Amino acid sequence: YLEHGLGQKWLGMCFAIFGSLAAFGIGNMIQANTAATAVVESLGASKFSVGLILAVLTALVIIGGIKRISDVASIFVPFMVAIYFVGALIVILSHLSQLGVGIKLIFEHAFTGTAATGGFIGASLAQTIRYGVARGLFSNESGMGSAPIAAAAAKTNQPAKQALVSMSGTFLDTLVICSLTALALASTGVWVSGETGVALTMQAFSAGLPGNWGAFIVTLSAVTFAFSSILAWEYYGEKCFEYFFGDKWVHLYRYIWVLFVFVGSMVKLELVWNFSDAMNALMAVPNLIGLVLLSGVLFRETKAYEMGIRDGSIDKFD
């Protein structure tokens, strides 16, 4: 759409470069590290062994072509979303008396240094917003242009319908799952424990669920979500790489991808987060330019689709 819709190939090339690099942060190393940390915290396994297993499974899918693994992951993800949703609700309801306090905390600290999870005490409003935007972008990828890569591969007679389906991902991910997680952390009070990331979420779930169920649900969810993200982002990154270099060197990208899954499971993430934030922003810039300049086409196609639904000329279930 940047090359053919706008006639600006240079924008498409910029997007392809930044997209192929951003994938190694948001979709590879951070995901692998999250999964490894969850398993280490829950089962006491080493990050080396977890990273090795994750890299082998990834290689079997993207290099070996064993699609059954990715098929199982794609089936398992909705199931795990439902379990995580129910688990988070139970945690919140078990601390219902503190829910109001938790919501108040979220709003009170939204524009203070505390919003940066204690690591940036005294941070300015600009810094807080910067980290909020960066983490929001990481959470739902809105505006990055990653989702259209997957949507473009979908078989549909109505592009507007596919766009609306893609939009639902942001709603489910951010407004539902992330909101429930935030409320669980705030209402249980574990946010002041000093833990971060998946270990903090484990504490919250363990505070509201019996036995080891909390740690089990968070661990399984983290591994499932991380692995599916690794596979999805390999596809995004590969398509960006292919646009710029052609399909001759795609196999090299896949080998490097698998290597970084293993490396990412063991590295300290501060540098990776900084790299990821920068690449995510750079990837979003050409995409947002395209969205603004092609907004007329967007509105026209959406309006035509909605009118077709109303007058019956388009079957919304087709």
What are these regions (language model features)?
Residues 4-16, 51, 156-172, 247-255:
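Membrane-interface alpha-helices at helix entry/exit sites of multi-pass transporters
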Residues 87-105, 113, 117-120, 153-156, ...:
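Extracellular/periplasmic helix-exit of transmembrane alpha-helices
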Residues 136-141, 145-159, 166-167:
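Helix-loop junctions at the membrane interface of multi-pass solute transporters
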